[in-house]
């Protein structure tokens, strides 16, 4: 999927291409949901949590950077920069944005506690306007073009906090069907925009496009209703960040990406 990603938007209509689009629409919400989970449970800053994350980054960056240097894919300077500055020199946009969120989150946590229901709704609207209208529809690089920005993560974090204080929906079937319908609609919109391009104002495979945001929130609320207890799922959950860091290393990504 990632291999063909640059061609998905401009590719001719075909069943095979639309099936790839469908799979992308199903999976693209993962990043948004990961950040919303952080907001739902709140980030708790501590030396231990930061050090644990930093050690994890240094370990994988050092391991694969040395391998890359050994195979001539990285210079000595790039190797040392990736080892000692894994957040900023590793080419991992997610880690840079998440670090910004990690540092700012205590302010959001404390501020949210002192807001009443009306103020929380107003602030939610403000975040959505900044992230979706200015960042996506207006394509303002100062804000959050395509969602690769800490502003988008702050919006998602706030949405996660907001959902945590909402009354949980008991009708998981309706939420599941709603999410499925949204994903199918997104796939149809992709086919339509081949003919009528202006529809991209509502949908494209960008993290802060309106339809992707809507699908992320509905899926997140649906997952809330699940009652699962699985060691395997927990193991996969804690491994997600490691998988992202590993696949972002040049020596690994070159095996999958040809662009």
What residue ranges belong to the model's regions?
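Hydrophobic transmembrane alpha-helices
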Residues: 36, 40-44, 101, 105-109, ...
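Alpha-helical transmembrane segments and terminal signal-anchor/GPI-anchor hydrophobic tails
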Residues: 150-151, 168-244, 248-259
């Amino acid at each position: 999927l990632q291999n063909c990603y640059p061609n998905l938007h401009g590719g001719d209509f075909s069943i095979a291409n639309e099936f790839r689009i469908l799979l992308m629409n199903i999976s693209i919400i993962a990043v948004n949901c990961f950040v919303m989970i952080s907001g739902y449970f709140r980030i708790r800053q501590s030396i231990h949590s930061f050090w644990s994350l930093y050690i994890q980054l240094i370990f994988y960056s050092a391991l694969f950077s040395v391998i890359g240097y050994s195979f001539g894919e990285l210079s000595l300077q790039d190797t040392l920069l990736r080892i000692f500055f894994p957040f900023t020199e590793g080419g991992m946009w997610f880690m840079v944005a998440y670090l910004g969120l990690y540092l700012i989150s205590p302010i959001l946590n404390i501020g949210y506690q002192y807001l009443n229901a009306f103020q929380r709704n107003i602030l939610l609207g403000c975040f959505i306007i900044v992230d979706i209208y200015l960042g996506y529809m207006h394509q303002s690089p100062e804000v959050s073009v395509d969602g690769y920005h800490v502003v988008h993560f702050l919006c998602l974090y706030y949405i996660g906090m907001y959902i945590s204080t909402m009354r949980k929906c008991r009708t998981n079937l309706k939420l599941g069907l709603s999410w499925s319908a949204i994903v199918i609609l997104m796939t149809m919109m992709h086919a339509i925009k081949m003919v009528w391009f202006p529809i991209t104002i509502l949908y494209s495979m960008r993290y802060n496009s309106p339809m992707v945001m809507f699908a992320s929130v509905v899926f997140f609320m649906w997952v809330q209703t699940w009652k699962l207890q699985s060691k395997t799922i927990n193991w996969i959950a804690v491994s997600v960040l490691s998988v992202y860091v590993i696949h972002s290393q040049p020596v690994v990504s070159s095996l999958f990406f040809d662009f």
